[in-house]
Amino acid sequence: STAIYGSKSANGVIVVETVRPEPGRLRVSYSGNFTYQTPDLTDYNLMNASEKLNFERLAGRYTAKSIYDSQDELDALYYSRLKEVRRGVNTYWLSEPLRAVLNHSHNLYIDGGDNAMVYGIGVAYSNDDGVMKGSDRETMSGNIKLSYRAKSLIFTNDFNIDVTNWDREPVDFFTFAQANPYYRKYNDDGTVPELLEDMNVAGTTIYNPLYLYNIVNTNKTGEMSLRNNFSIVWRFLNAFQLRG
């Protein structure tokens, strides 16, 4: 059995043959599966805008630590953020890139034949979207199997094709998790600002993850695989078989 089926079959194998369809009639089978997924953010316990700003102040974020730091600029940065907090800004970023999704998969198989020839044709499709917006995967596959029996010989050909396409989210979840709650998502006119803050301290540029998310970009990957297996089985003495 090792020579025929590989090293994992050293202790022996059990060969199972499916029930042949009734001669002259087609047999059709279908299966489908639907799943609903929704993100769960209950484990995240983040500081609100006021708590985060006060934490940064106590940690010395707005205190000059060297001659290269400008205390005036740090004070201006702190009070501009405090102004946002006092006007009611308290942004929850985590839910922005997430969504609830309904995924589905389908399998259709048709087979038929007679005592000598058996054939089967199968197609499958699955749509697997992630809870991150823009994270999608689509899989399609097909299969054609032919089996011909001539006395003690069985000729089998099995052809398979698989096509997979997937998209990745343009901005990762961690980028949204890092965005501070005292930043506004939108301008007063409803537009999405490119930067979360006009002030640029110590060369740090803070981009709005929503703006990055809405930039037209493509992050697609696809692959296709083809497989064809042909085998001949010779059964003899009612107890032995050779496979090639």
What are these regions (language model features)?
Residues 20-133, 169-173, 208-219, 233:
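Residues embedded in well-ordered regular secondary structure
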Residues 9-37, 114-190, 218-244:
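Transmembrane beta-barrel strand/turn architecture of Gram-negative outer membrane proteins
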Residues 1-8, 38-42:
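N-terminal plug
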Residues 197-199:
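Acidic, low-complexity proline/glycine-rich segments
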